[in-house]
Amino acid sequence: MIPGEYVLSDTPILCNRGREAIEIEVINTGDRPVQIGSHYHFAEVNPLVTFDRVRARGMRLDIPAGTAARLEPGDATTVRLIPFAGGRLIRGFRNEINGAVESCMVSGASEPASGTGETS
């Protein structure tokens, strides 16, 4: 091996394999592009991007880590979303959930079940 040499596998790396995914239609109704990172809580993206936010709660884009999707003004497209894994704690972003995703998942609700979504 040569110092600094890369030895790559012929086998492709499969991202998010086995994760249950959904597809939803989104439209950027704003006049500026919107960029959404791979691990951004999709339900909290720019309010000028219209889509079913209840279905997107607890989900992120099904794209490789560190990448992003860009929606140009007027763009209508379908995105593929997968659930957050691990402890499923959503903190920050637009501060709409700020706690356990499950505490905010109420069937048919358009707002979090309890204020900030904080758990004790």
Swiss-Prot record:
Pfam families: Urease_beta. It is an enzyme of class 3 (hydrolase). One of its GO terms (molecular function) is urease activity. Pathway: Nitrogen metabolism; urea degradation; CO(2) and NH(3) from urea (urease route): step 1/1. Belongs to the urease beta subunit family. Heterotrimer of UreA (gamma), UreB (beta) and UreC (alpha) subunits. Three heterotrimers associate to form the active enzyme. This is Urease subunit beta.
